[in-house]
Amino acid sequence: MIKKFLVAILSGVMITSLVSCSASNNKKVDESNMAAKSSITENEEASFIGEGEWATDYTREEVTTLNEEITARMEEVCNFLGLEYIKEEKIKEENSESVNDKYIYFDNLNPEPNKIESMYYGFKTYGSNMAKGNLNLKIGLKLDLDQIKNEEKFDLKETSISNFSEAMTNDIERDYTEINEKIIDIVKNQNSNGTIETNLNGLVETITIKDEFLLYRLDSKMYDFKK
């Protein structure tokens, strides 16, 4: 079950909630429930392998502009798919450090095969002076294991992951053939800890498969705004 390996996206001690809205209504979200929702393992200190345009030493203003553009595209995808989502800005504590987190999030309880269980996209800045920051996309997808094992069929492009991934990269021409083959191979060979890591023009894409769920991450470098 995805709850066993996806740790709460919105974990940490929330100090202040600054902004909150929904795509289709103004329904309030129970904060205690949100903290318990499925989410994605954090490993912000992992070594960064990306090379490319996104690995540029962007300024805070440049990353802020990129985040605004990406967030707008993420909202367009949510609206197109008819998904209710949360858009918030929070200040919280992570590892004894103040973190400002601007994010868009939704979850889908009991998803059908090849459907998203949860999605988070956010721009985090760290420290009281917000001297560094990064962009992160995290998605949990329930796999159709029978289809993959029996028919050797899986296409990431046909899932909503591609919509959100392309909203971040702004690249709609990607060929998913190689990544699909790797995912099928992991499932067929029952590699319980199978992980695929790819550089997408300076963003690091990480796909981890555990049981019947696929965990998708797309991370920018940690930008140093003091440079």
Residue map of PLM features:
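N-terminal, intrinsically disordered, polar/charged segments of Gram-positive cell-envelope systems
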Residues: V7-A8, G12, S22-Y105
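C-terminal motif of bacterial Sec signal peptides marking the signal peptidase cleavage site
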Residues: T16-S20
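Structured, amphipathic secondary-structure segments that form assembly/contact surfaces
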Residues: N110-P111, G133, L141, N189-Q190, ...
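Long, charged/polar, surface-exposed segments that mediate recognition or autoinhibition
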Residues: M119-K188
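Short, charged interaction patches at domain edges and termini
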Residues: T198-K227
